[in-house]
Amino acid sequence: YQGDYQFSHEIEHYVGKELFTSSMVLKTSGFNFYRSLNRELYEFDPEKSFDDSNSTLYRCVDYLQKKNHTTVITYNYDTNLEYLLKKRGVRYTVVYDDNSFSDQEAQVDIYHVHGLLPYDRYTERKYLDSLVFTEEEYYYLYNNPYSWNIAKQLHDFKFNVCVFIGISLT
C-alpha cells in the first residue's frame, strides 16, 4: 500500500463486516480496494478447492453438467464457477452488464447481477464499472425497474424453481 498501512489494514478488516461499503472507502488514498478484493476472492489452493468432491461448488457443477441449458444467477463477483465449468468442458456464457448476452448454444448461462471481477483482469474498467458495492449503487440498481439485473431476477423467481446457496438474505 502507498498510504498509511495501519489505516489500510483497518479498512480492509472492516469492509467485509459491513452490509454496505461506503463510497468513501473505495476512494481512500493509498488503499487499492479492488486489488484487496481480488486477493480475498482468489487466494486459495485451487487443487484442494476445485477437486474436492464434497464442496458445494463441485456438486453444483455436477448438477449443471447433467442439465441442458440451465441459468445460474449469482451475487458473487468471482469466476470460480466458470473456472470449474471450463475445466470440466461445459460450455457456458457470462452476463455481467448491458453489453454481455447469453448464448443459446451454451449449456449454462451465468448472470453476475452485482458485477464480475475476474482473477486476471480486475483492473479493466468494464469489470470495475459492473460492480455493485455501495449503498448508493444498490439503491440505484434496485430502484431501476428496467435494468437487466432486476428483470432477470424477477423473471426467474416467478417462473422457475430457485435454489439459494451461500446467501444469508439478512
Specify the residue positions occupied by each region the protein language model found.
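Conserved catalytic-core helix/loop/strand module for nucleotide-ribose chemistry
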Residues: 1-170
